Amino acid sequence: MSRNEVKEGRLADFIQRSVATAIERDLKDPALRSLTITEARVSPDFHIAYVFWISQNRDEAAKALERAKGKLRSRVAKGCGLRTAPTLEFRYDELQDRAVRIEERIQEALRQDEEMEKQSSEKGFAGEENPYR
């Protein structure tokens, strides 16, 4: 791992913690109460930080994040140790939704398997005994 990759990782961790803490403690917007910061990534040139989030009220939270973007960037700038703080780009974390959909599909497939097993166990062979013995 190169020195830059290590720095990117540390900066991303710092940004994730700073943004999450600022949302929890400093911002009073009710739309951000159910918001969770799931991850942060930093571009190789440290100019852009992609902050991934999830929330129950997606549209309201997205608007609230846009309104708070300047305050959050100021909070990051205070402790990041860079000449200029990275621009924060907020992106909804689709991974969580995909995981939920996959889990639902797995549960549905298991239910169908159980139904088929139940139906096949209730049915017998056409004759008195198993012809395949």
Question: What label would you give each PLM region?
Answer:
Residues 1-48, 54-133:
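Charge-rich, low-complexity N-terminal segments
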